[in-house]
Amino acid sequence: MAHKKAGGSSRNGRDSAGKRLGVKAFGGEHVIPGNIIARQRGTTWHPGLNVGMGTDHTLFAKVEGRVEFRAKAGGRTFVSVLPMTEAAAE
């Protein structure tokens, strides 16, 4: 009897969905309190003035204003929100 031996199953064939990480509000954009500025794993960007950080390292605005990214010594990038009064003056 001619039989074909059962073929093995592939060990690849799976992939995880993208996690939608990254900057959601770029420098110069207007934000209101609670707006998400960036989603990240770990601290790629650090919270600066008027920016809070959630338990999953998400950065969010605490006040209404304009987003600003600023590189500091040590290679860290801080994200701040300049309040409306300061942003209007510039």
UniProtKB/Swiss-Prot annotation:
InterPro entries in the cross-refs: Ribosomal_bL27, Ribosomal_bL27_CS
PROSITE patterns in UniProt: RIBOSOMAL_L27
Gene Ontology BP term (one): translation
GO molecular function, one term: structural constituent of ribosome
Keyword Metal-binding: no
GO cellular component, one term: cytosolic large ribosomal subunit
Renumbered residue ranges of the record's region Disordered: 1-20
SUPFAM superfamilies the record matches: Ribosomal L27 protein-like
Keywords assigned: Ribonucleoprotein, Ribosomal protein
Gene3D superfamilies listed in its UniProt record: 2.40.50.100
Membership in a protein family: Belongs to the bacterial ribosomal protein bL27 family.
UniProt protein name: Large ribosomal subunit protein bL27
